[in-house]
């Protein structure tokens, strides 16, 4: 859904007022900890497990792998799952308003100590896996992990795990003794290592230079042993592994390095998750400053997962931290991303993480960080806060941005900003699901409005730390009345007086000031705010969240196909659970009609899969092209575009695994289905079809396959 609105005249709302101070409402189903498909009402707190809290010193590594002082930031420092449990139970996280935690990859990592340039390195970060079906003992046992899930859920906190199926661990192609040779284990049983890889578990194409997407997918990231996802053993193993963690009760998945794995395989992976136990999943696709990537948008819109919103993060850092852009640039980012992401509310927003310099610099004015937090917490998307941000941690690049959290103070201004604003996501659906509309702007001031039905939040930010701003002519959707700042003046905000037609009285926004004013009202007509997951096969139950659905069952529409009765498994005013009907594969608009027949808004771009999915590598040989031409693939199922050149898969690759004039691409297709397909050449609007009869093959019921054909002139 496109959720950035251009400024328009506000409509007066003749409704009773809810003033700026509020208390959390009783949890509705859409805001429940049991809602694993929707994180729009949540605030995520990212924890680097080893650097947070040592709750069980007995599981600390011994010898040279451990530094209890955390002086060498490339060694283990002792943080574990029991430490996180302790901080859940003592109220530090719940007091901050955190409702989801994202923890380091929990799987067993290598035990070797690797010396790079004279410095010892360990797998403290969790990204050097050896066995995806066992735990990292430095973090805890399976029982400890289960205790973490139970403790978090008891405090209404969801648990997201980092998952890095791109690679195992560092390896050397000519030194089998280096580290652990990238070896991969299946619950303790060795599957193979990087050298003498007779099973072809890994890629052996050298290291990536990041020059092309293909280069980044099929070559190694640095010295990490790159898994071959076109290998059936690897494919089945990774899908079985994530199902194990789903069975343990996780609520979400953060996928590492999604830009560096075959997109078709990842879609089949997400189908495996969504068809089994769907949870909110988001991937890491790094974008640099001012980088806008159509490939990034396409992946978010078609893969079945959302993304970490680096475009958002980089712009927030430019505007609030580095002063290299202004509020017009911030507005342009909001407008552009709303147009480019089909579900912009599902993208995970942040201001820093373990792969970037920390937002705060030790000598910087703290108000910059506090304003960036306020903006992120009240903007579209799912906000994620990196551990220690609330304690003003500073630090440059890896590993300095991964230090041990220095304290657990609840009195810092940053902690209190989060504490005051995080509950809005549960209490006011305008923050969780609403559109975004600029209401007042200059280089230093942005006043924006979030709106969902009759629910409204207005946020004013003056990033100029030295000069106040005189605000006149502000028009909002707030009903007539006086509104207290939700922050209670913590960032020098003020009360807002609103007259008829939403016109605000003139006021002065303090230097460095930030204020949030909000209003809630019952939603009388059905309004969809979120659908999750956004891709699954018929028969899978999906969750529709919003307001005003009513208490009696109505009807859910997938395109023109109506679903009612027993296929709607749950219907409440804020949440509907419905089984996907037996419709053909393809994209559908979803809408809801309540029991009285009143229709909701349309939620678009839902993909019904043609069935369970497998990843298949399509190869076409001797397809010569003119300069500017590329080869694409289409066929008889929706996953291949249903013979529509505009929806064809590609452009295909021709540099790494196969070389020009041979082309290849890994594609997610329905398992066990006989498929007809052809290749075509595209250059702009000109399409040249392959000649001859359609190619035909039957996809495997599980695992992967490669289909290799010659171009038919």
Curated annotation (Swiss-Prot):
Q: Please list where the region (D) is annotated.
A: 523-609
Which residue stretches belong to region C?
434-522
- What cofactor does this protein call for? Ca(2+)
Compartments annotated for it: namely: Secreted
Q: Which InterPro entries match?
A: A-amylase/branching_C, A-amylase_C, Alpha_amylase, Carb-bd-like_fold, CBM20, Glyco_hydro_13_cat_dom, Glyco_hydro_b, Glycoside_hydrolase_SF
> Which GO MF terms are attached to this record?
alpha-amylase activity; cyclomaltodextrin glucanotransferase activity; metal ion binding; starch binding
The record lists substrate as bound by 127-128, 167, 172-174, 220-223, 254, 259-260, 354, 398, 402
Q: Reaction catalysed?
A: Cyclizes part of a (1->4)-alpha-D-glucan chain by formation of a (1->4)-alpha-D-glucosidic bond
IPT/TIG domain: which residues?
526-607
Q: Report the record's Gene Ontology biological process terms.
A: carbohydrate metabolic process
Q: What is its main location?
A: secreted
Known Pfam families for this protein? Answer: Alpha-amylase (PF00128), Alpha-amylase_C (PF02806), CBM_20 (PF00686), TIG (PF01833)
Please tell me where Ca(2+) 2 binds in this chain: 166, 217, 226, 260
Domain CBM20, by residue range, is 608-713
Q: Where is this region: E?
A: 610-713
- Locate the residues binding Ca(2+) 3: 342, 604
Annotated spans, B: 166-229
Question: What is the similarity comment for this entry?
Answer: Belongs to the glycosyl hydrolase 13 family.
The UniProt subunit note reads as follows: Monomer.
The name of this protein is: Cyclomaltodextrin glucanotransferase
- Please name the source species: Niallia circulans
């Amino acid at each position: 859904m496109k959720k950035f609105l251009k400024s328009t005249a506000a409509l007066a709302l003749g409704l009773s007022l809810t003033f700026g101070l509020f208390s959390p409402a009783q949890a509705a189903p859409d805001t429940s900890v049991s809602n694993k498909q929707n994180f729009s009402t949540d605030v995520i707190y990212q924890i680097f497990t080893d650097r947070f809290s040592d709750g069980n010193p007995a599981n600390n590594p011994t010898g040279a792998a451990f530094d209890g002082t955390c002086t060498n930031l490339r060694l283990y420092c002792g943080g574990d799952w029991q430490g996180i449990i302790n901080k859940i139970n003592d109220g530090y996280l719940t007091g901050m308003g955190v409702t989801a935690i994202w923890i380091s990859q929990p799987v067993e990592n290598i035990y070797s100590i690797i010396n790079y340039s004279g410095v010892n390195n360990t797998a403290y970060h969790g990204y050097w896996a050896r066995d995806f079906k066992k735990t990292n003992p430095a973090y805890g046992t399976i029982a400890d992990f289960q205790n973490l899930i139970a403790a978090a859920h008891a405090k209404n906190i969801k648990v997201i795990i980092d998952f890095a199926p791109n690679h195992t661990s560092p390896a050397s192609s000519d030194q089998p003794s280096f580290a652990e040779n990238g070896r991969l284990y299946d619950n303790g049983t060795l599957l193979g290592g990087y050298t003498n890889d007779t099973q072809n578990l890994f890629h052996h194409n050298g290291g990536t230079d990041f020059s092309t997407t293909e280069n980044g997918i099929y070559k190694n990231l640095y010295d990490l042993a790159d898994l071959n996802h076109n290998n059936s053993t690897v494919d089945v193993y990774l899908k079985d592994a994530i199902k194990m963690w789903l069975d343990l009760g996780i609520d979400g998945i953060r996928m590492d390095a999604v830009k560096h794995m075959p997109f078709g395989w990842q879609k089949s992976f997400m189908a495996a998750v969504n068809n089994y136990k769907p949870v909110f999943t988001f991937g890491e696709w790094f974008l640099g400053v001012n980088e806008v990537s159509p490939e990034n948008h396409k992946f978010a819109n078609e893969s079945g997962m959302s993304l970490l919103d680096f475009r958002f993060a980089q712009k927030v850092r430019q505007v609030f931290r580095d002063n290299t852009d202004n509020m017009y640039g911030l507005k342009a980012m909001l407008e552009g991303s709303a147009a480019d992401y089909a579900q912009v509310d599902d993208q995970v927003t942040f201001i820093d993480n373990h792969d970037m310099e920390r937002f705060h610099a030790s000598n910087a004015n703290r108000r910059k960080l506090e304003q960036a937090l306020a903006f992120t917490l009240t903007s579209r998307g799912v906000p994620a806060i990196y551990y220690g941000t609330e304690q003003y941690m500073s630090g440059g690049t890896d590993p300095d941005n991964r230090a041990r959290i220095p304290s657990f103070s609840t009195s810092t201004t940053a902690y209190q900003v989060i504490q005051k604003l995080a509950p809005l996501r549960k209490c006011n659906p305008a923050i969780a699901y609403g559109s975004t509309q600029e209401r007042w702007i200059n280089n230093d001031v942005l006043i924006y409005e979030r709106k969902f039905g009759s629910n409204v939040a207005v946020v004013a930010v003056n990033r100029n730390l030295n000069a106040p701003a005189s605000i006149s002519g502000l028009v909002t959707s707030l009903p007539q009345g006086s509104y207290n700042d939700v922050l209670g003046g913590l960032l020098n905000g003020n009360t807002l007086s609103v007259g008829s037609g939403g016109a605000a009285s003139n006021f002065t926004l303090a230097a460095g000031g930030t204020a949030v004013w909000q209003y809630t009202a019952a939603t009388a007509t059905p309004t969809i705010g979120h659908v999750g997951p956004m891709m699954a096969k018929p028969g899978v139950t999906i969750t529709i969240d919003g307001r005003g659905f009513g208490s009696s069952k109505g009807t859910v529409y997938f395109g023109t196909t109506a679903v009612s009765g027993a296929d709607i498994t749950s219907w409440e005013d804020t949440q509907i659970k419905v089984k996907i009907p037996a419709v053909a594969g393809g994209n559908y608009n979803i809408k809801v009609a309540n029991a009285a027949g009143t229709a909701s808004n349309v939620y678009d771009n839902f993909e019904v899969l043609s069935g369970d999915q497998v990843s298949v590598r399509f190869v076409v040989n001797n397809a010569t092209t003119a300069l500017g031409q590329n080869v694409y693939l289409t066929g008889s199922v929706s996953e291949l575009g249903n013979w529509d050149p505009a929806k064809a898969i590609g452009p295909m690759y021709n540099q790494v695994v196969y070389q020009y004039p041979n082309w290849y691409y890994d594609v997610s297709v329905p398992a066990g289905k006989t498929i007809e397909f052809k290749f075509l050449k595209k250059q702009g609007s000109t399409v040249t079809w392959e000649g001859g009869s359609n190619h035909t093959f039957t996809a495997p019921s599980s695992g992967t396959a490669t289909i290799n054909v010659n171009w038919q002139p």
